[in-house]
C-alpha cells in the first residue's frame, strides 16, 4: 500500500531525526518499536482473536503512557516557555512531544490511514465543518456569558509556531489514535 510506505517512511525519518538531535534515546526507540509490533499484530487477521485483542489492549495502554509522557526515553523540546499573551492570561508553555507524535505516526505507518484522497477530505470537511463552527460559537458564547473568558483579540508573534506544532504534533497523533486505531477497531468488534 502506498500510504503505508509514506507514513512508515515519515515515522522512521522522525525517529532517526530524534536520535540525531538527542530527543530520543534507546528506551524511547524500544518503546516505539514495541508499539509498532503491537499495532502490526492487531492488523494480522490470520492470528488468533485473543492475541489480536491482547495486542490491541497493550497497544492502547502503551500509547496512552507515551502520550502522557510516562515512558522515559524522550527529551521533548520546549519551544515556548512561560509566555503570557496578555496581562491577565496565565503563562503558556509548549513542547514538541516526540513520544506522542510517534504514537500517531506509528499508527498511520502501519496501515491505519485516516484519509486517503482529496475526495475523502472534501467529504470529511462537509460533514464536520458545520458541527465545528456551531460548537465553536456555542462554547465561545457560553464561556463569555459565564465570565470564564473575555475578548482580547490579537495575533501573537508565536501563532504560526503554535498552529504548526498543534496541527502536526497534536492533532495528527490524536486523530490517528482515536479515529484511526481505537474507533476503527471498536467498530470492527461491535
Per-segment meaning from a language model:
Residues 3-107:
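Alpha-helical transmembrane segments in multi-pass membrane proteins
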Residues 73-170:
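Juxtamembrane helix-loop-helix connectors linking adjacent transmembrane helices
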Residues 4-10, 131, 162, 176:
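Small-residue packing motifs within transmembrane alpha-helices
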Residues 1-4, 19-26, 125-129, 186-190:
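Short, amphipathic, aromatic/basic-enriched membrane-interface segments that mark the entry/exit
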Residues 1, 38-46, 113-120, 178:
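C-terminal ends of transmembrane helices
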Residues 176-190:
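Membrane-interface helix/loop boundary segments of multi-pass membrane proteins
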Residues 170-176:
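Hydrophobic transmembrane-helix microenvironments that flank and shape a buried ionizable site
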Residues 4-6, 155-159, 190:
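Membrane-helix interface segments
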Amino acid at each position: 500500500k502506498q500510504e503505508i510506505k509514506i507514513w512508515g517512511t515519515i515515522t522512521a525519518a522522525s525517529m532517526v531525526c530524534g536520535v540525531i538531535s538527542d530527543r530520543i534515546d534507546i528506551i524511547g526507540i524500544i518503546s516505539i518499536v514495541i508499539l509498532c509490533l503491537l499495532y502490526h499484530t492487531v492488523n494480522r487477521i490470520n492470528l488468533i482473536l485473543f492475541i489480536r485483542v491482547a495486542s490491541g489492549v497493550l497497544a492502547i495502554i502503551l500509547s496512552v503512557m507515551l502520550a502522557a509522557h510516562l515512558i522515559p526515553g524522550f527529551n521533548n523540546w520546549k519551544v515556548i516557555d512561560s509566555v503570557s499573551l496578555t496581562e491577565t492570561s496565565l503563562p503558556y508553555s509548549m513542547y514538541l512531544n516526540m513520544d506522542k507524535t510517534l504514537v500517531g505516526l506509528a499508527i498511520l505507518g502501519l496501515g491505519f490511514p485516516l484519509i486517503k484522497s482529496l475526495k475523502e477530505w472534501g467529504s470529511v470537511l462537509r460533514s464536520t465543518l458545520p458541527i465545528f463552527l456551531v460548537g465553536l460559537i456555542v462554547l465561545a458564547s457560553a464561556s463569555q456569558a459565564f465570565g470564564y473568558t473575555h475578548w482580547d483579540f490579537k495575533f501573537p508573534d508565536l501563532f504560526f509556531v503554535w498552529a504548526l506544532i498543534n496541527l502536526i504534533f497534536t492533532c495528527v497523533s490524536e486523530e490517528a489514535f482515536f479515529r484511526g486505531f481505537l474507533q476503527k477497531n471498536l467498530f470492527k468488534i461491535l
